[in-house]
Amino acid sequence: MESIKNRTSIRKYAEKEVSEELLNRLLEEAERTPTMGNLQLYSVVVTRSEEGKKALAPAHFNQPMVTEAPVVLTICADYRRTTLWAENRKGTPGYDNILSFMNAATDALLFTQTFTNLAEEAGLGTCFLGTTVYMPKMIIDTLKLPKLVMPVATLTIGWPAEHPALSDRLPLRSIIHHEHFEDYTPEKIDDFYAEKEALEENKEFVRINNVET
């Protein structure tokens, strides 16, 4: 997929709506993503209203794309639905430990990535907001998330109004281990991060923050 090879975060969007039909098609296609035990331990809250986006913005450090994007998706680890299903069938769900959350978070993040790939292949731009897990309580309150539902990812979505350069990536040799894990030596670290440290924006970051590296 060329959209994956050329993938970059889009933070500026054209003043053009993302149709309900297109969004629902992409969400439905993303449901085909792998899921633990076929339980689909995730839910998605779709925010389109200006009021809703403005309410979410403080939880994302008021980054402009939250209010400027036509659509904001909050993807949640959700084992409430499965728990209630089990309880309503007189079963014991057993979703009361850290493994439960890890399973649900994994499902949610797999769904997020699949949706991102599909959306970008359809010509949309997206931005993954890592701020979701910084202040989850604010998001929980804003979206009225009940017990056993936890926000783990946020995507802003719209038609791109910018085409930024690709972000740098570490060389393949830095992430692949053959047969067993090979621990990192100082020499390997120097090798892996040499290109990143040579980038002008990273040199500027070092200068501004008055640090050695």
Predicted regions located by residue number:
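Acidic, surface-exposed loops and disordered segments
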Residues: M1-T213
